[in-house]
């Protein structure tokens, strides 16, 4: 039965609130202050993503391990003191641990009884971090929609993540393994918090006064929103709310009244807020990156680097953590709680302990993902694209981590130079997001052809690095990433391509999915992204251990980047769209036929899953 409530009116009598979907829902009109609270968290966390994960965390991990490591050939310390005295503070000098690129000069540390290259240690850490992040994202995605969990989880992830960054100031080389643990926790909190942050957006949009005004001008009654944050008519309200809480497989009706190609006011506002949030986050990241470079330059003039080569880097991570924590506090003050429905009815709460309800929701999240995957398998174009995205997202993640470590260990670039490289890639990525639509329009490229062009340019990066294996170029000492300056043009290529791939792949996937199931399929898209990104770094880490060179990873990366091209070429967007529309009809019809069976302890919509398109 629907929950009926008379829509309240604001004190000024101008902005009318929509009726709540459930008792206790906060339908207060969204204010600019609240939107800025949403922006504030993007400003907070994007700094850790770019300056921490994308720049200084890999360097810190490798340097901490190196200062505790030994040379594989002689078992001498990789870092030795410059004076006979072994007391800290007398100055240190990094030993030459790779003179001719042979295994005998590797700097290694012992991890779980295994001798691991210090660069591999960083790659393995990020591989584990991404895997844990993927498992956490899937498990906790459903919890954010209930009670006050949305804001509680956002703040918890933000505060814990920022603390992990700040705690690096206390991590010395003898306890370098703790740095790996902090990275896993920090990366997990970062990714999880962005998912929770995105869950605020439909709620903010649905309660925005401009949306309410737009619907009023169109002669529509203000109505509650469905699970997608979309307005539903009062005549559909009973059906929408009476659905069992477990039925999130189909999340609304297929839109039939809106003309093709027209964008709803909700979609326009959501896109505008989202794009501005991304832009502000990147601007904040560039600002803090510049501050970090200035800090590194200033600290290089002090005695801190003589005590430990990681101290300046740890001070940068302290700055990043303080920034993340500070702007999370702004979000805490400006974002409203916007609670979701209760986890259980009063009777259910009496019968079940709270932890059992949370476990049930975690199981529900995995069950929902599995249901969506079984439907996706029936959509040929969707499954081909997801396989391509699985490979492509892994390649993008692997290139980023490998490039930072290559610049540091092979090219011997300073931390300041690596910071400048990160800024170059970030600014290029921002430019790429705007440039590729222009290129695609000028060349009249289809979306999948634009993606293929981006991938082809991406392939330039590992191929150029492999040129150093050609004797002629190796003799020259230039070409093939043998000089530090060569990596900056490739950083521009990486940024431009990454910006185009991120935007085009997401929008192209949106053309293929069944209307009305966007939330479920984008959850599968995100799981595919995060679920694959731990494989590449782990394999590159093994190659580094086997060869003693980061450069050897370019062979694997070159193959990994090429694999998605034929798959993207095979995707027929028009057929995929038609299949998606057909599946939407099947899902809607099946939901009506099996609505009475949903929510049972063991029943599933086997009818729709057994059908062929």
UniProtKB/Swiss-Prot annotation:
Annotated Pfam families: ATG22
List of glycosylated residues: 90, 448
Organism whose genome encodes this protein: Aspergillus fumigatus (strain ATCC MYA-4609 / CBS 101355 / FGSC A1100 / Af293)
Similarity-based family: Belongs to the ATG22 family.
Membrane topology per record: Multi-pass membrane protein
SUPFAM superfamilies: MFS general substrate transporter
Swiss-Prot/TrEMBL GO biological process terms: amino acid transmembrane export from vacuole; autophagy
One GO location term (cellular component): vacuolar membrane
Name the UniProt record assigns to this protein: Autophagy-related protein 22-2
Disordered as annotated region, ranges: 1-30, 592-613
Transmembrane segments: 41-61, 120-140, 167-187, 189-209, 278-298, 307-327, 382-402, 418-438, 453-473, 477-497, 508-528, 553-573
Principal location class: membrane
Function: Vacuolar effluxer which mediate the efflux of amino acids resulting from autophagic degradation. The release of autophagic amino acids allows the maintenance of protein synthesis and viability during nitrogen starvation.
Subcellular location, record wording: Vacuole membrane
Alphabetic keyword roster: Amino-acid transport, Autophagy, Glycoprotein, Membrane, Transmembrane, Transmembrane helix, Transport, Vacuole
CDD domains: MFS_Atg22_like
